[in-house]
Amino acid sequence: MYADVSDNARIWHNAHVSGHARISGKALILDNATIKDHATITDNASVANNAIVCGQALVKNKAMVLHYSVIGDDATILNDSVITSMAEIVGDAVIAKNTDYEVFKNNWSSGRSFTYTKSNHIWCVGCFYGTGQELIEKAYADSETSGQNYERYVNFVEGK
């Protein structure tokens, strides 16, 4: 397993690149960022501030992934998009502009952030990955308070 760093890409400030990751096209990886597996960062994209890009994820076209965010599976981030606020973007999500995802904070129990991606209509909450209806059902199974709160977020975001 060898990562490939080429075409004026730069790795700085304790960044980590491993597996079969490909960094090229003047991409910049810095500040404790991790790029691993078969992830690709290219075309002036940047990953920094403890962010992780893994799986087969692709970050390109001046996109930036920052602040403990996680991009994984087959997700694609492009077109100057900025991913921040501990977002977790996975599956087959495509983020082409900043309004293609939302990050919220669970302020009623765990304090954990959770993410909605518009391209695939998926919610990512800790270990949970699924539709709004699946999230509501799981949350009610956990507690009435969680169910009510997640249902409010799903209804707000999905316009129900």
Describe the role of every protein-language-model region.
Residues 26, 105-160:
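Terminal amphipathic alpha-helical/low-complexity segments used for targeting or macromolecular assembly
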Residues 85-118:
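Ampipathic, surface-exposed secondary-structure segments
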Residues 45, 65, 77, 100-103, ...:
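Intrinsic disorder/low-structure terminal segments
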Residues 2-98:
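A detector of tandem-repeat and repeat-rich interaction/domain scaffolds
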